[in-house]
Amino acid sequence: MTSDQQSEDSAACKTFTGSGATCAAAWNAAAQTMNGQPFYGLMDLAVLPAGCNWPLAEEIAQLLQSTARPAPEIAVFVLDPAVQMPIQDQTPTLYENLKALEEKQQLHCGLQTLFDNAETAAVPVSAGGKYAMLFYDTAGNTARQTQSPLAAQLAAILCGQAHRLDCTLPDDLYLAAKAAADVQVLAPGSVRVNLTLRDVELKDLTPATRPDAELQVAFAAAANREFDGLITALYGINGPDADPLDLCFWLQNRYGSTQGALRAELTLHWHRPGEG
């Protein structure tokens, strides 16, 4: 999808499609249908196909990196599997929805981040106004996807792709949470992840009004369960083959190596107004 620089309506856009044996051939075929010379310097969003495996994701990302600049400004998503194909008629709405999601959640997966780690890559998957996180194992050509909004947002924060929590917790907790989030990782022997929450809004979804302290306890318990689940899913029980959340990095810096299963714990800090 491109903006039409010749249109008096600045919101106007056009969709061009092409097919080919490779991503580059398809891109070139689409470009040939345009009137005028395409300019890629203002590209700000790339959407990978639903179910995209790592070789295809890598091929698309490398093509974008060699064609469009500046690459770090291009946000990357994996397409929501629920989006009906073909998407030509839905493209403007899809673009608007993804940009709105990016702004609301303060989420940004830059194109360059797909190449920051040789063993793994993390990309958000749009999911009906929410997102999941998809972790590619680039060596094994496998992928794992988070299963809950809270797990996805914790993973995105740990990856440095997000700085905000905004989700409804599982049904049995009847709780919604919003907060700005900062993360600090320490490695005194095991990995300790300090998550500081600022401007916190905890909303009780039950008819009763539970005190804030009770809501904080419920949220902390849910966050720790999801964090433990992430560590188990992404690092396994026999020691990590990759470091998708960059947690082993801190242990390696301090001790030179990591041995055995990763031991990590999450600690929440509630920032109150007026505190530094």
Residue ranges and their predicted role:
Residues 1-276:
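Membrane-proximal alpha-helical signals and transmembrane carboxylates
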